[in-house]
Amino acid sequence: MRLNCFRIFVHIQKPTQIFKPFYRSLSSEASDKYHFVNGHKMSKAPTDMAPWPAFIEERIKLWDKLKAEYDAEIAAKESEPIQITLPDGKIHEGKTWRTTPFEIAERISKGLAEAAVIAKVNGAVWDLDRPFEGNAKLELLKFDDDEAKQVFWHSSAHVLGEAMERYCGGHLCYGPPIQEGFYYDMWHENRTICPDDFPKIDQIVKAAVKDKQKFERLEMTKEDLLEMFKYNEFKVRIITEKIHTPKTTVYRCGPLIDLCRGPHVRHTGKVKAMAITKNSSSYWEGKADAESLQRLYGISFPDSKQLKEWQKLQEEAAKRDHRKLGKEHDLFFFHQLSPGSAFWYPKGAHIYNKLVDFIRKQYRRRGFTEVITPNMYNKKLWETSGHWQHYSEDMFKIEVEKEEFGLKPMNCPGHCLMFGHMPHTYNELPFRFADFGVLHRNEMSGALTGLTRVRRFQQDDAHIFCRQDQISEEIKQCLDFLEYAYEKVFGFTFKLNLSTRPEGFLGNIETWDKAEADLTNALNASGRKWVLNPGDGAFYGPKIDITIQDALKRNFQCATIQLDFQLPNQFDLSYFDEKGEKQRPVMIHRAVLGSVERMTAILTESYGGKWPFWLSPRQCKIITVHESVRDYANDVKKQIFEAGFEIEYEENCGDTMNKQVRKAQLAQFNFILVIGAKEKENGTVNVRTRDNAVRGEVALDKLISKFRRFADEYVADTEKSEEWA
């Protein structure tokens, strides 16, 4: 019978053909307050469908049967004594297949058990109610831990998915956690979700949270999975195309059962505060020629206070949106005749160039050599690098004299050509090539978002070619560069993640192990906390991912440090060792800013348009008290401009002095220089800040000297009183 069901599905072409047959009344009895499904009691919400889709009951029936078999199998397992070691070295006794992380947490304190979101067992996240299977090292993670947040938001996505099914009976697709929150994709034959539906879905969310539905884990065979999800073509596709193991896991909370690796929070009651934030359309697996889906986004927290704080930050973020500030401050704009490519006004270009200049100065101090490479290459280069096979859909292609060329989406293959063009010896390494070349990526028009997702951009791209024994020191220097730029100059905090060998890796295990050990040693030597992401590395080498947090507590991934063993092989790169024998160099991909466009967007929003002096396109403005001092004002302007600073002066402004000062402050000029007869006589200017702090008379030569220090040392808050003492 199961085979017949499966054969029916593989021949079905459209989801519409599988939707209606399962829309029948549930046979389960119900009351005014509760749903009863196969003996399970669940709170009703006023906005629930009546009746629920029949697939919910059929799914639960199969679950109950298989779960009973699974529980009996676990109960029959022989339990053996084990030791559970905590991070502080304390050891707790337990038993295999019986003792759970939650029980250990309760032994320590009830408060810890209640606050814990998820467990980490032998380095892998683990359900709090899932029994240990052997001796274990145990960590208990709270919501402030990044991995715990991802689990919490993943569980919240399941709660949202349950509400979506109960509200309109759609077929769920993918529902992952994202950098901040989560989403769920749903297909529906004839229903469109809009913001007016959010409060109604939220009522069902609240009912699910009130029930404290347990998150339960079950391993199922592929055959049983096809039977359970036969009503949903999208799940059938995942099962048939993505699952290559005899068994996989599903999780249940209340009426929802879904394909999922887990782990999850203990029960839905942990999600005390949730908000649906927006909706959008999407395509199945991101393919434009596939079915159109509906996507709901959400955010959640363990308490309502955190949700309110987050909502306040979102209100502030809306005010600081870089697209809004870019327009208000005359920084950049976009035009339909060149989508995804920014037009930079002079003030925006000033910021852009200052960021590039900052990196250039660091390159000189840190041993990087800047190179210039072509924008366009014959497709043979991209075939050698592998990009033509795996990335060509995202490239802009051009035919030149009957041969196909591609605009470069990254610099690394060109740098490989440069390294391979001349012979090298071991004592010449490392080579550190840096490149600000223009890159192009053929992003879909619907994905373009201001400066954060563009088609034309520049990166502070660098590639280091080094020996195996130089990896650790090079990584250490890269981390030092990041720390200086992010923390000391931009004022960000950042986190480090080490992503190691994935399943489909290229190369030999010994080389990978050595590289991962080098990265681990460099991270440990940095003295910073870092997180291991097993199996999340690139196929060509392990990497360090860097996530920054801005003034609005938002996280962004900009920088990266990646080891690459494959491109040197593909381009047959070599150097001569001390014995005169050819050896293969290691390649390190490295960026600090990442895309200059994207970093400009992040900084615009983080600073809220109040640029630090060294980056500011509006460093100072002259305001004169009387027309008799205009000649002196123009002389001041000339000296400050020739010293290399941005200064403005309107001779014939008809506004009062107070109004001019206020306008300059709102325009975020760092300093307002007021000039009257006294200042002209003394050769000074009267300095005010954009925050209306009066710093008094300052001699012009002394002011220029201060400006130089502010710019050269990247002083963050030049308006502070101690800077003017």
Swiss-Prot record:
PROSITE patterns attached to this UniProt entry: AA_TRNA_LIGASE_II, TGS
The keyword Metal-binding belongs to this UniProt entry's keyword annotation: no
UniProt main location, coarse: cytoplasm
Entry GO CC: mitochondrion
Top EC class, one word: ligase
InterPro entries: aa-tRNA-synt_IIb (IPR002314), aa-tRNA-synth_II (IPR006195), aa-tRNA-synth_II/BPL/LPL (IPR045864), Anticodon-bd (IPR004154), Anticodon-bd_dom_sf (IPR036621), Beta-grasp_dom_sf (IPR012675), TGS (IPR004095), TGS-like (IPR012676)
Subcellular location: Cytoplasm
Family statement drawn from the similarity comment of this UniProt entry: Belongs to the class-II aminoacyl-tRNA synthetase family.
Name of the protein this chain belongs to: Threonine--tRNA ligase, cytoplasmic
Gene: tars-1
